[in-house]
Amino acid sequence: MRITVLGAGAWGTALSVGIAPRHDTLLWARDAAQAAHIEASRDNRRYLPGVALPAALRLTADLDAAIAHAQADGGLIVIATPMSGLREMLARCAASGAGLWWLCKGFEAGTGALGHEVAREVAPAARVGVLSGPSFALEVARGQPTALVAASTDEALRNQAVEAFHSESLRVYTSADPVGVEVGGAVKNVIAIATGIADGMGLGLNARAALVTRGLAEITRLGTALGARVDTFMGLSGLGDLVLTATGDLSRNRQVGLQLAQGRSLPEVLAALGHVAEGVYSAATVLARAQALGVDMPITAAVVAVLDGRLTPAQALERLMRRQARAEGHAPD
């Protein structure tokens, strides 16, 4: 199968490393110098250092050529840019005829749209889906066992994703609920910032467990309000991705929270991180979308208040703990 991966960041490179030995894979990098260096050195030193690229993996900085590569023989295009680049890439690929998958997790800044909503607007006739789940790029690239979910309303496209991505180290499940899969992938980044803050403040494992559990309740409330299935949030893209991102130190969003708890400013944290932490950019959008739907998301609101400087981490914690006691469940709490 011909597969094009658009975006030579950590995730795009990691997925390419996994599929290139089995499929005709072309990895596109926006920067020509970066593409040439990666192809010559067989190492993406900036985003995935120390991982050798397979000889079969080719690189290009020519976007038109990258798209054309997947047009033949019913190929696939995987968009591995940050959420901010999804609209542009979908528009460029809309007429290709290839199946389109994206890896980014978040709500689009400005519009508040999820990936499938962006696709409906700019590529309404395309076959599209989202590939998500608990997955650190470095572990995927190393061939460590990972499970993902391929979500699309197109059954044939879901089956094609299994053929393309499933391997001895990467297990791919399918879902017909892209809304739920996208909400889980987007909001868990915000909850991971909250758990990072709590851990950075030394609040203990009880507090971490409470934030993860009540964070899952927030994710579920928002998702079902948007039309998702409840059981989706008990799966890989919900509970699975939340647990990994909230507790694993390879998580960029968790690292943001840990550093904020140490008193560093957000600009300092982001400069030191050097990579995109989607939760920082989508938190306010998540909250705005929830408020428009009348969905209560107190943990998300606390994270937004810390990110924009209205509350310190300690003040945000105090506000959460002083909330009126309620019954547990998915009703507003």
From Swiss-Prot:
It is found in: Cytoplasm. InterPro entries: 6-PGluconate_DH-like_C_sf (IPR008927), 6PGD_dom2 (IPR013328), G3P_DH_NAD-dep (IPR006168), G3P_DH_NAD-dep_C (IPR006109), G3P_DH_NAD-dep_N (IPR011128), NAD(P)-bd_dom_sf (IPR036291). Pfam families: NAD_Gly3P_dh_C (PF07479), NAD_Gly3P_dh_N (PF01210). It comes from Methylibium petroleiphilum (strain ATCC BAA-1232 / LMG 22953 / PM1). It comes from the Bacteria. GO terms for molecular function: glycerol-3-phosphate dehydrogenase [NAD(P)+] activity; NAD binding. HAMAP family: NAD_Glyc3P_dehydrog (MF_00394). Belongs to the NAD-dependent glycerol-3-phosphate dehydrogenase family. GO terms for biological process: carbohydrate metabolic process; glycerol-3-phosphate biosynthetic process; glycerol-3-phosphate catabolic process; glycerophospholipid metabolic process; phospholipid biosynthetic process. Its EC number is 1.1.1.94. Sn-glycerol 3-phosphate binds at K105, G133, S135, K188, D241, S251, R252, N253. NADPH binds at W11, R30, K105, A137, R252, V276, E278. Pathway: Membrane lipid metabolism; glycerophospholipid metabolism. It catalyses: sn-glycerol 3-phosphate + NAD(+) = dihydroxyacetone phosphate + NADH + H(+); sn-glycerol 3-phosphate + NADP(+) = dihydroxyacetone phosphate + NADPH + H(+). Catalyzes the reduction of the glycolytic intermediate dihydroxyacetone phosphate (DHAP) to sn-glycerol 3-phosphate (G3P), the key precursor for phospholipid synthesis. The keyword DNA-binding does not apply. Its main location: cytoplasm. The active site is at K188. Keywords: Cytoplasm, Lipid biosynthesis, Lipid metabolism, NAD, NADP, Nucleotide-binding, Oxidoreductase, Phospholipid biosynthesis, Phospholipid metabolism. The keyword Metal-binding does not apply. This is Glycerol-3-phosphate dehydrogenase [NAD(P)+]. It is an enzyme of class 1 (oxidoreductase). GO terms for cellular component: cytosol.
